[in-house]
């Protein structure tokens, strides 16, 4: 079970933009990550490679400070907002909930929930 300080350190790493480093430093070796109802990706190395590839396609990824962070035993819920600017300069926003199950001080499972009708809508950079 993570303590709140450990979760806040994870959130700060993501907000700083070090998404791949956050996976390296805060996820279990056998962690899984799942988008809405798609099949989960499994294994920390797979998760880091997927994140690095996604970020490499972008000009910029801005992570807003978490809107809410709830910690209840091994369960953590974070409301993230991401602004992704593509190579042509168009910025799109994702507002999602990440539901995590921690094992000790690392994330074992994470699933993202968002409204597919509004996900990645075009916004002014912010």
Q: Regions from the language model: what does each represent?
A:
Residues 1-29, 124-126:
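Short, low-complexity N-terminal intrinsically disordered segments enriched in polar/charged residues
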Residues 5, 20-72:
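A solvent-exposed, acidic/Ser-Thr-rich amphipathic alpha-helical stretch
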Residues 7, 11-14, 27, 51-55, ...:
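Hydrophobic alpha-helical core bundles mediating ligand binding, dimerization, or RNAP-core interactions
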Residues 51, 64-70, 81-82, 95-101:
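Hydrophobic/aromatic beta-strand elements that line small-molecule binding cavities or substrate pockets
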Residues 57-60, 84-93:
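Short, cysteine-centered beta-strand-loop-beta hairpins and adjacent loop/turn segments enriched
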Residues 111-126:
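Low-complexity, intrinsically disordered terminal/linker segments enriched in charged
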């Amino acid at each position: 079970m993570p303590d709140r300080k450990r979760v806040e350190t994870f959130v700060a790493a993501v907000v700083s933009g070090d998404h791949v480093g956050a996976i390296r430093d805060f996820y279990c070796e056998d962690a899984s990550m799942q988008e809405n109802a798609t099949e989960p990706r499994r294994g920390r190395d797979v998760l880091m490679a997927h994140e690095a590839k996604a970020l490499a396609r972008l000009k910029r990824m801005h992570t807003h400070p978490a809107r809410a962070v709830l910690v209840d035993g091994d369960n953590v819920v974070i409301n993230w907002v991401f602004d992704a600017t593509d190579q042509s300069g168009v910025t799109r926003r994702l507002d999602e909930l990440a539901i995590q199950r921690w094992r000790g001080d690392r994330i074992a499972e994470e699933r993202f929930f968002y409204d597919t009708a509004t996900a990645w809508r075009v916004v002014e950079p912010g």
